[in-house]
Amino acid sequence: MRDEQATGAAITFDRVEKSFAQKGGAPVMALSDCTLTVEPGAITGIIGRSGAGKSTLLRMVNGLERPTGGRVLVGGRDVGAADGAELREIRREVGMIFQHFNLLASRTVFGNVALPLEIAGRPSSEIRTRVADLIARVGLEALADRYPAELSGGQKQRVGIARALATGPKVLLSDEATSALDPETTQTVLRLLADINRDLGLTILLITHEMGVVRDIATHMAVIDGGRIVEAGPTYDIFVRPEHPTTRSFLSGVTGVTLPAFVASRLRPAPPEGPSQEVIRITFAGRHATDPMLARLTGELGIAVNILAGAIEEIGPHPFGNLLVSVETPRGAEARAYLERHQLLTEVLGYVG
């Protein structure tokens, strides 16, 4: 049965709750009041620390876990209420890749990719054609007859991706799919997922504890903390204006911009007596990311600026940068007002004497 109001979304988490019974004790609440909409064709990353509830949330999409409250809808169909034939139909539309690959050691690359099609009862001729196409898509044509023990970690994950695509799903779930890979292989797998998303229009929902993965691939993101979704939206918007402390904590490890230790150790929440400097974070976003605003600030207002740290990178197609600076405290408000008039974001981090 479809929910007509939710059929426009690929996946809808509607006030989802999940608790687990404990022998001789009160139930443990894993998820509480989680609401999130995953748009068709988006790559949505759910980030959270270990134990935050992200894997539990992901496993509800294909019915591996059932909510104890709320609903999980895939294409408007309630996964938690589905059973038998309807649940099998939903699962055919949802592929999944795993952190540890889950390949059958006794089957070749071809055999692993073919397995879902064999289970679905597809004709042999269709299986051969489909598997050959998928193996080519993930760049493993030369390894079709190899066994998992003969493959690298990145190659195993490519097999996992091809297998997940075998039945032509509309949604692909990624459960920490790159966390067991080295950085270079991680980037290769992320590029492959981005290509699949672009070429097939596939909706991808991934979970990770690495903000770098979200930055590199996700169009949208959600932050989960203590079983609750505390922030969600377009990835670029959240990187530019993070609101929740958990989000800020994750971002501090990926933007590459932290205060030097000799400044951080002296930072105070209020100006000390005597001469002091106001420490400011400046966020450069979009078309303003490469503007020479500090030179203009000094030239037009005569405010001396000390640069403490900085970096610029890309979030999707958009440039994004952070700069940590200090100015004389009496002129801090004037400097911030000037920068904000020119569409930059500022935040006072504290003061040093």
Curated annotation (Swiss-Prot):
SMART domains: AAA, NIL
Residues given in the record as ATP binding sites: G48, R49, S50, G51, A52, G53, K54, S55
Coiled-coil annotated spans: none
Keyword Acyltransferase included in the entry's annotation: no
Domain named ABC transporter: residues: 11-251
This enzyme's EC code(s): 7.4.2.11
Domain of life: Bacteria
Membrane topology annotation: Peripheral membrane protein
Disulfide bonds: none
Cited CDD domains: ABC_MetN_methionine_transporter (cd03258)
Function in brief: Part of the ABC transporter complex MetNIQ involved in methionine import. Responsible for energy coupling to the transport system.
Subunit structure: The complex is composed of two ATP-binding proteins (MetN), two transmembrane proteins (MetI) and a solute-binding protein (MetQ).
Name of the featured protein: Methionine import ATP-binding protein MetN
